[in-house]
């Protein structure tokens, strides 16, 4: 899937239609041994277990602000208002032959009732992890959870998109 995405981006660059086009990537691949998750950029993947009110996995942003936070140069609160908070340090760019590699993780501990949440950074602009857990732990239908997430992001200035994957059964 990643090779195909790079191939299509490169075709756009060759055709001259790229206009410095770049994108993030988030990918979940479910298989008999669990799930393989991969990402490039600042779109995020979460694996949540509402039954224990736990985030089991949260992808690491490939962004300047996150790198500075990890290095101890910014606090968590300073990250939110840092002027260059939207600078991405790894992305898929049309015509960029270096083809940055994604972070890849295998997740085998998947249980019925778990959720995977894939979202762009705009979905998280005003939402903390604890609030996200509260939404997914709420005793309401998935459609209502979706509406709760939409209402939390209605004032966001960044683009926002998301996918919710609810694990019903595991074989």
Show the residue positions of the predicted features:
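PP2C/PPM-type serine/threonine phosphatase catalytic domain
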Residues: 1-171
